[in-house]
Design a protein with these regions (language model features):
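Active-site-proximal, well-structured secondary-structure segments within enzyme catalytic domains
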Residues: 162-163, 167-169, 191, 196-199, ...
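Substrate/cofactor-recognition hotspot
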Residues: 280, 286, 293
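Acidic/histidine-rich catalytic neighborhood
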Residues: 515-530
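C-terminal, non-catalytic "cap/extension" segments appended to globular domains
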Residues: 28-55, 65, 394, 398-410, ...
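Active-site recognition of the HExxH zinc-binding catalytic motif
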Residues: 300, 307, 403, 484, ...
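N-terminal helix-rich structural modules
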Residues: 2, 10-12, 19-227
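Alpha-helical segments
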Residues: 34, 469, 473-477, 493-496, ...
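Alpha-helix N-cap/helix-initiation motif
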Residues: 284, 288, 388, 392, ...
Length: 530
């Protein structure tokens, strides 16, 4: 094994670099590989992921290599600034080199992440998660360099294009939020706060995860589950036949369970378990109260060190809302209009429940169940029957036609491109009068074993839009977890919620791949600084 060290300091005589003092080193073990093999990205072939030949070893090797390259590239840029600051062009000598290294890292990282999500047997957690964290740290290096930050601060942006000005703004905002305007003592204090926040957040998330998995309740009575939809029964069943039981209630299916469970005590029990996750009501070793207060205090301290009134005010630097006042005003206006209607709806729901035999006042664990019953009574709205109107293929076809018409696009399936699973399809996106694709979209719609489950799905950019990557089109993966078809004659049927998810994520994917900018820093989801 060849051992590559990341995070190693350079032995140069130059002013103290505070970000290096807080940077932690780490080690990546890379399989032996010749330099020629890594001259071009071995995970891609002909502009597309080389699915047939991708292995975990190749993923680790390639991502590790580009991690090294990126960190080395940031240091090279710093050295250039130190040695000849007055001879450098902002974009030719600073932005372009960072883009070249950054885009290669992002493209490799994105592909490896997609493979981890769609098949964590082929790319297991232990092989991916440590690399993911290291890539995340490496990517932040360019925003933690005082030399790079100060070089950006000293530039006259008046003659730059709008896109170039946005790139400069991105670096300035990120540098400011990383404490690069602070003096040495405050910078060191801010670094300690940042590290403490990361530690507290990790502990908080771990306790939430462990605590959430503690709750379980077994139902043996089929009368309770007789109105449960098939997908809920399948998610709960402890036997091969989801209709026979027994059934296990967990917090993973809490929302849907509250909608369908007719037993108020069972609803309350499950709701209370969800409410008490990692709280003072549970085991002491899983109580998050102290971590929550620590996170709040550290956030306040970080904001004050940077000169903000609160963490919320600091957060607005990277949000389209612009200010806390704008958010408060918007929420106030919405509340003023919506509250009378909400009160009217709650009164109506209470009356309906009482007329249907319910005694007492509706509580939070009652509302999902009675809301569903009321919709069924008033509008004959049954989510399960509505699914018959939304077979996946029909919805996707209609969505593609709508998007094509609205944006003057042509979206065609590319069956010749190999994918990681037969369910996954590839689509090329063209301008109507152009034969060269603007972008490529992988759509992997159905849940399956070894595929990471997220209810709302996710969009992963596997190759960003950036001039540094050349003429190859950007690529994104739209990964969803809809129920798989039972057979070729039984299509996957979507709920209205599923349809909303598909529309939302498809739009997010288009935002990723249809950028027309030159620079990764402001491409795709980077429209807002992060």
């Amino acid at each position: 094994m060849a051992v590559s060290i990341l995070g190693r300091r350079l032995g140069l005589n130059r002013p103290q670099r505070l970000f290096q003092q807080i940077r932690t080193g780490y080690i990546v073990l890379l399989p032996e590989v010749s330099p020629e093999q890594l001259e071009q990205n071995p995970l891609y072939k002909g502009g597309f992921p080389d699915i047939k030949n991708i292995t975990q070893e190749k993923c680790v090797t390639t991502l590790g290599k580009y991690l090294l390259d990126f960190e080395h590239g940031v240091r090279q840029v710093e050295n250039e600034i130190i040695e000849k600051p007055n001879e450098l062009d902002l974009f030719d000598n600073i932005v372009e080199p960072l883009e070249e290294y950054g885009t290669k890292l992002e493209a490799t990282w994105g592909l490896v992440k997609a493979l981890y999500v769609v098949d964590n047997k082929k790319m297991p957690s232990e092989g991916y998660l440590s690399l993911h964290e290291r890539a995340r740290r490496a990517r932040s290096l360019k925003y933690n360099s005082r030399h790079i930050y100060n070089f950006f601060k000293n530039q006259d942006v008046s003659k730059l294009t709008e896109e170039e000005q946005r790139v400069v703004f991105k670096f300035l905002v990120e540098g400011k939020l990383n404490g690069l305007d602070l003096d040495d003592n405050k910078r060191e204090a801010f670094a300690v706060l940042s590290k403490d926040l990361a530690n507290e957040t990790a502990k908080f998330n771990h306790r939430v995860k462990v605590s959430s998995e503690k709750y379980a309740h077994i139902i043996d009575d089929p009368i309770i589950t007789r109105d449960f939809p098939e997908d809920l029964l399948q998610a709960m069943s402890l036997s091969k036949d989801p209709y026979k039981g027994p059934w296990k209630v967990t917090l993973k299916i809490l929302d849907k369970f509250l909608q369908y469970c007719p037993d108020r005590n069972l609803r309350w029990n499950a709701w209370l378990a969800g409410r008490q996750v990692a709280s003072s009501e549970g085991p002491r070793e899983l109580n998050n109260s102290e971590h929550l207060e620590n996170i709040r205090q550290i956030r306040r301290d970080m904001a004050r060190v940077l000169g903000y009134d609160s963490f919320a005010h600091m957060s607005m630097e990277t949000k389209m809302a612009g200010s806390v006042e704008n958010i408060n005003n918007t929420l106030g206006k919405i509340l003023e209009i919506a509250r009378p209607h909400q009160e009217k709806e709650l009164n109506s729901l209470q009356s309906f429940a009482e007329e249907s035999g319910f005694n007492g006042t509706l509580e939070l664990w009652d509302i999902p169940y009675w809301e569903r019953k009321q919709k069924l009574s008033l509008y004959h709205w049954d989510d399960q029957k509505m699914k018959e109107f939304f077979p996946y293929e029909k919805v996707l076809s209609g969505l593609i036609k709508t998007v094509s018409s609205c944006f003057n696009l042509k979206i065609e399936e590319a069956p010749d491109i190999t994918t990681w699973h037969p369910d996954c399809k590839v689509y090329k996106i063209y301008e109507v009068d152009n034969v060269k694709p603007l972008a490529v979209l992988y759509i992997d719609p159905f849940r399956r074993n070894n595929k990471l489950f997220t209810e709302v799905g996710q969009v992963i950019c596997m190759r960003p839009k950036a001039r540094a990557l050349g003429p190859s089109p950007p690529i994104a993966a739209l990964i969803l977890n809809f129920p798989a078809p039972q057979s070729p004659k039984q299509p996957s049927l979507l709920t209205l919620k599923d349809v909303n998810i598909l529309f939302s994520k498809f739009g997010e994917a288009l935002q990723q791949v249809l950028s027309v900018v030159n620079y990764l820093e402001v491409s795709g989801e980077n429209i807002e600084p992060k």
